[in-house]
Amino acid sequence: MKGIVLVMDGMGDRPLKEFDNQTPLQAANTPNMDEMAKNGITGIMDSIAPGIIPGSDTAHLSILGYDPYEVYTGRGPFEAAGVGVDVIPGDIAFRCNFSTADENGIVTDRRAGRIREGTHEIVEVLNTMVLEDYPDIKIIFKESTGHRAVLVLRGEGLSDKVSDADPKVEGNKPKEVIPLDDSVEAKKTADILNKLVVKSYEMIKDHPVNLERIENNEPPANIIIPRGAGEVPVVEALNDKYEVNSACIAETGLIMGIGRFAGMDIIEMEDVTGGIDTNLENIRDTIIDQVKNSDHDFFLINIDGADEAGHDGQAVEKRDFIEKVDRVVMSELKKLEDVYIFLTADHSTPISVLNHSGDPVPVIITGPEVRVDDVCEYSEVAVAKGGLCRIRGADVMNIMMDLMNYAHKFGA
């Protein structure tokens, strides 16, 4: 028996006036998800705990059965591992954004117009960076999907106890990175990052990719903004923890990195962006091929577009993307036999918030021996009446392993 945990990143939301006080999921036409709800057991889930606002990283760790309060060291190492950068003990890794700044250093677009092409060429220039005051520190950049990138600092005397440079909203300069403790290492690392942000603008503002973007009235990716400092985490292999053969199918470096640290096989895909313009047909075909033809028996799958729309405040686009996932992906996945599917989100990304929130997310479990409840619709409101009631992310793997007959009895 095989199992799938399919996470629609950021799908949860709050009622919107433009949808007659419905969420984008409620407003969406999702006949396939509704059919799954009718044929499955439903409920709502707090990825970590009620009211706790999870990151995508901490939410996925919890969903995979890890305690994020114990294993989470920061976002950076997971992002780095996800794009193929080997992070070694002593390294400090960061998630970065390619962003747009004006001549006064004001950030005018935190995601550089959701840039899709040219970041590899920009990174080639950034990887020649040497800071005059810190020539012994190796600076490693690597592009990820879209506007995302990673930074790894390698050298002696570094610390992950530093703040983020991300201003969170446009119209401000990058935040000054400050040490979060009084150590020499934290002060040194903060100084390196502040100098690096300034240097990045100097190095790439006139890059040919950016000059072309300006000519095309597109925001240039002319500054790097790091956040999510972290050192190498210690994560028990998922295959050892649950005695499964697992794989991760994801679009973004963050989720692939979590999968790598968890020892999962990473199934890479072409032509996926992590946005609403991603190639859902490729994602669908990859899932079906792996489930039918590989020897993996457990899959973590992440589809990211709804989260992007939530962050950008695009209500219609979020609704439409959910509908497209239903039409393209779920219409075929629901036909899989001898497979348990756990469909959920990692967190809510409400249009009104433009960020994550602590609202619980909807859950469906379908499969051969699921106890079917009387819920017939997949939405945040409808599934709250379901047979699973309200669970936490930490419950997901226990439930799935039990259904798949991989669980062990507790007690005599």
From Swiss-Prot:
Keywords: Glycolysis, Isomerase. One of its GO terms (biological process) is glycolytic process. Pathway: Carbohydrate degradation; glycolysis; pyruvate from D-glyceraldehyde 3-phosphate: step 3/5. InterPro entries: Alkaline_phosphatase_core_sf (IPR017850), ApgAM_prokaryotes (IPR023665), Metalloenzyme (IPR006124), Pglycerate_mutase_ApgM (IPR004456). Its EC number is 5.4.2.12. SUPFAM superfamilies: Alkaline phosphatase-like. Gene3D superfamilies: Alkaline Phosphatase, subunit A. GO terms for molecular function: metal ion binding; phosphoglycerate mutase activity. It holds the Pfam family Metalloenzyme. It is an enzyme of class 5 (isomerase). Signal peptide: none annotated. It catalyses: (2R)-2-phosphoglycerate = (2R)-3-phosphoglycerate. The keyword Transmembrane does not apply. Belongs to the BPG-independent phosphoglycerate mutase family. A-PGAM subfamily. Catalyzes the interconversion of 2-phosphoglycerate and 3-phosphoglycerate. This is 2,3-bisphosphoglycerate-independent phosphoglycerate mutase.
